[in-house]
A protein has these predicted regions:
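Extracellular adhesion/carbohydrate-binding repeat motifs centered on closely spaced tryptophans
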Residues: 1-171
Length: 171
């Protein structure tokens, strides 16, 4: 009979004080699979209603910005995956999809009424003048798209349409 953390045939397991194997639960800082009882590694696990964490090769929850299987995710300090959130990480803004939690790339996202951002191929909110889908657009220093305002760009005072935000060349 065994108690505590044990490695058997290269797999990590945990046994309670009553010698029962931990399955589908956390113990000793690790999560143990509900079927096999093996410590879970390199996999997402559900930690609450629509709340997920990712366990690294050591079975520990990851935190911060993480590249996992070619996708970019963010995990809060408690290891819970960010979903449906605009977050700033190391001075760059990212938006994480409300369903998948993946960083949004190459698309516009409306954060609130009238507040739009565009996220590039790296998942970062763009700033300054951008040409997107053939239209000249402008994003302020915070990444918000400018609409219905004049902005100084390249020494010119430019107006950006109130509806779509495109530069109106003759106004």
């Amino acid at each position: 009979l065994v108690k505590g953390a044990k490695v058997i045939n290269g797999n990590h397991y945990y046994f309670n004080n009553d010698y029962s194997q931990v399955k589908g639960a956390w113990a000793n800082g690790r999560y143990y699979d509900g079927d096999s009882g093996q410590a879970v590694t390199n996999r997402f696990v559900q930690v609450g209603a629509n709340k997920w964490a990712y366990l690294n090769q050591n079975g520990q929850k990851v935190v911060g910005l993480q590249h996992i299987n070619g996708k970019l995710y963010y995990f809060e300090g408690n290891g819970v995956q960010a979903k449906g959130k605009l977050l700033t990480y190391r001075g760059k803004k990212y938006y994480f999809d409300a369903n998948s939690g993946e960083a949004v790339t190459n698309r516009f996202i409306q954060i609130s009424h009238g507040v739009w951002y565009y996220f590039n191929a790296s998942g970062q909110a763009v700033t300054g003048e951008q040409v997107i889908n053939g239209q000249h657009l402008y994003f302020d220093a915070s990444g918000r798209q400018v609409k219905g305002r004049y902005v100084w760009v390249k020494g010119q005072r430019r107006y950006y349409d109130a509806n779509i935000g495109a530069w109106v060349r003759k106004r």
